[in-house]
């Protein structure tokens, strides 16, 4: 058997296959299976062969993970200043050929070296908050992002780009929208969230176009109005390349686990689209009528806990009771249809429905309903069941926000002493009133 090279070596191998011998060049990664050799090809894809299929293998060099670590890159100080705030995710990452894993690449020099076109758009500053999976992000990290954005604006940045894992990117975008515009104001510059659905080691990665478009919008986008654009997301508009969508942070949601165009609007429209071509980047016109004043951001009380449940056959009163006993501050239930809950017992054979209704009516903490349909309003005036829910104290009627935007809104309201009757109001673009007419 041919002697296998160590991980990280660049090799040329010849292996047997169903169609005969095949020659491949790439970098050796940890084997995808026992007794296999795996190499990363120049096109970004990985291939694996059983050891006994490899006829010859030749080392042709090493692959370094730090080849750009000591780069000194000169920036154009005349361009708009944009601060990139990194929280994690794959958008600012590269392959560690010693382990085969995707690792953070967030020294500013390395980031600029990987996407040098950014230098033609903006003068880049960078700050690293962390390198977290987005599902590990908590309200304390929202506050860190808020502070980092305000510091960037205070230091002269016209916009910030927050690189973020995609799974909860829309949740953080909602949180910052309320922080900067929930009180009727707006941030001093553009706040742009972006991420990558496909890791940067894949040929189909969306990282470069998303990052380019996000920096472009942070530097050159429309003036912030505070109504839907206090924080925006910039991600692929379709499955193909060339167009990225600018969407309200409070109006967008990740709707697919893997597609590059996973981020879709909920009950609203995109703000703009950015075209990427050989001639450069450009965006469709934007018209905004509001003229809010720039205000300092508010924060989130990290001691607040909000329970979330799903309405359906297994929603029972003991869940509501448990949340109260555990000192939760509020409960959000993702209701069916127009926001309904299983609280009626018309046949007389479902006493758990009566128990649920009684527990909600006497709850010591707010019980709020969101729309598990995602699109459409919570309208508790259409059917008698909805009116009954309002009579026992269920809140949320009139909201058209996504469940994630509603979660951020409830947390923001509780953190800042607001009455939860504001859930039906449009504070910063989260509610589309036309859906209730």
Identify the function of each model-found stretch.
Residues 162-189, 343-356:
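Short Gly/Thr/Asp-enriched flexible loops that form oxyanion-binding sites at enzyme active sites
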Residues 98-105, 174-192, 207-213, 252-255, ...:
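A glycine- and small-aliphatic-rich helix-loop capping segment at beta-alpha/alpha-beta transitions
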Residues 85-86, 96, 107-108, 113-118, ...:
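Accessory alpha-helical/coil subdomains and C-terminal extensions
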Residues 85-87, 162-164, 192-195, 229-236, ...:
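Short beta-strand segments
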Residues 5, 36, 45-46, 53-151:
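ATP/NTP phosphate-donor binding region
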Residues 47-49, 195-276:
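Internal gly/pro-rich beta-alpha loop/helix module
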Residues 86-92, 164-170, 238-240, 337-340, ...:
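Gly/Ser/Thr-rich loops at beta-strand to alpha-helix junctions
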Residues 2-75, 338-437:
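C-terminal non-catalytic interaction/assembly regions of soluble proteins
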């Amino acid at each position: 058997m041919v002697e296998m090279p160590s991980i990280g070596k660049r090799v040329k191998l010849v292996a047997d296959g169903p169609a005969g011998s095949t020659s491949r060049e790439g970098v050796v990664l940890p084997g995808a299976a026992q007794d296999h050799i795996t190499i990363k090809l120049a096109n970004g894809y990985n291939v694996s062969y059983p050891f006994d299929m490899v006829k010859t293998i030749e080392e042709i060099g090493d692959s370094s993970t730090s080849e750009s670590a000591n780069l000194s890159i000169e920036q154009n100080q005349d361009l708009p200043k944009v601060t990139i705030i990194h929280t994690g995710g794959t958008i600012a990452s590269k392959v560690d050929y010693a382990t085969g894993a995707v690792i953070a690449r967030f020294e500013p020099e390395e980031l600029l070296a990987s996407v040098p076109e950014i230098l033609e758009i903006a003068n880049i500053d960078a700050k690293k908050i962390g390198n977290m999976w987005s599902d590990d992000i908590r309200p304390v990290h929202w506050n860190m992002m808020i502070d980092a954005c305000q510091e960037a604006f205070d230091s002269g940045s016209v916009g910030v780009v927050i690189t973020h894992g995609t799974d909860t990117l829309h949740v953080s975008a909602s949180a910052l929208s309320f922080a900067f515009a929930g009180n009727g104001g707006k941030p001093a510059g553009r706040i742009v969230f972006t991420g990558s659905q496909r890791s940067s080691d894949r040929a189909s990665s969306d990282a470069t176009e998303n990052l380019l478009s996000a920096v472009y919008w942070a530097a050159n986008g429309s003036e912030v109005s505070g109504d839907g654009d206090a924080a925006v997301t910039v991600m692929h508009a379709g499955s193909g390349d060339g167009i990225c969508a600018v969407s309200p942070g409070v109006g967008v949601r990740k709707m697919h686990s893997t597609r590059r165009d996973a981020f879709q609007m909920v009950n609203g429209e995109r703000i703009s689209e950015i075209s990427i071509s050989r001639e450069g980047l450009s965006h469709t016109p934007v018209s905004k009528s509001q003229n809010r004043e720039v205000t300092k951001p508010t924060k989130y009380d990290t001691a607040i806990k909000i329970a979330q449940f799903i309405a359906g056959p297994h929603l029972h009163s003991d869940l509501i009771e448990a949340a109260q006993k555990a000192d939760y501050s509020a409960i959000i239930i993702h209701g069916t249809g127009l926001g309904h809950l299983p609280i009626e017992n018309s046949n007389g054979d479902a006493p758990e429905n009566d128990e649920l209704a009684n527990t909600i009516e006497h709850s010591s903490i707010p019980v709020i309903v969101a729309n598990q349909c995602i699109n459409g309003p919570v309208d508790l005036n259409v059917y008698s069941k909805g009116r009954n829910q309002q009579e026992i104290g269920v809140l949320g009627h009139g909201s058209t926000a996504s469940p994630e935007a509603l979660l951020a809104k409830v947390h923001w309201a509780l953190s800042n002493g607001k009455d939860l009757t504001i859930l039906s109001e449009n504070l910063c673009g989260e509610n589309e009133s036309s859906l209730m007419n």
